[in-house]
Structure formats: C-alpha cells, structure tokens
Amino acid sequence: LDAYFEALYQTEDIVELKTLENQIWLAWRATDQPAVDDFFAQGMDAMQVADYRLAIDLFTNAIDLHPDFAEAYNMRATSHFLLGNDFESLTDVEVTIDLEPRHFGALMGGAQIAMRSGQVELALEFVEAALEINPNNAMWQVVAERLRDMTGTLDL
C-alpha cells in the first residue's frame, strides 16, 4: 500500500490518480480470510439493494471475526450514515481512521457527517486531512475551497 499512496500523492494525471485510488480500495477490501470476505461481500450486496440494516449486521459479523478490518468499519459507517445514524457513523469513521490513518474515504465520510450536522470547521478538517493524502483530487479541492469560503478560512 505504501507505494500506491506515494504514487497517489505525487501524480497529477487524472487517469493514474483514479487507477491508484481503485487499487487502494481493492487492497483495503482484501483480508485473505474467506469467512470475513464472505460477510463483507454480502454486506456490499445488501448496500446495493439499500438494505442498510442488513449491511450493518453483515459488516459487524466481518468485524467480529477480524477486528482490525478497517474497510468493514468504513462500510458500516457508510451504512449508518445512509440510515441517518450520524453518531454511529462517526464512531465507525474514527475507528477506521485509527486503523488506517490514510483512509481518505473515511475522512471524506467524516466530512459529510460533519456537514450534515452543520459543523463546517470539522468538515474542513476532514477534507484537508484527505487532501494531505491525495492532494490532486480536484473534487476534494473544490469541496475544501467551498468549506473555506463558508468558514472564512484562507488557503495558506
């Protein structure tokens, strides 16, 4: 993963950036533990059909078997977010980041939770942390700029 993150930090090529992001996501989702992978895959399937409560249960099963599986926490956070459970979602975002500090997906998820609750400064902190990992993501740059405008913060 370190090589992917180093390349992600350095690239300005949009195609390479998206390829690297996808490779990182694939690496985050791999555990080499069949039962864990099965629960995770079933959770992803449940999310595809908007059965977020089932997804939460399945991701929890994966976490019970593999407590260090950051991506299971991240997807459970996403499921909670989609159900409007912001406290539970933010709790899982924090665990995800504790397990994988470079988890730009969890950081951006944290920003969404913060925005939904009106915590613009916290949202900006999450987005800026994601940009430290992936500084050339144009969408995140725009989000950060808008949040800075909302908070009156200058980009230094």
What does each of the following model-derived ranges do?
Residues T19, L26, A30, E125, ...:
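Terminal, low-structured helical/coil segments at or just beyond the last alpha-helical repeat
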Residues N61-A62, V95-T96, A129-A130:
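Canonical positions in the second alpha-helix
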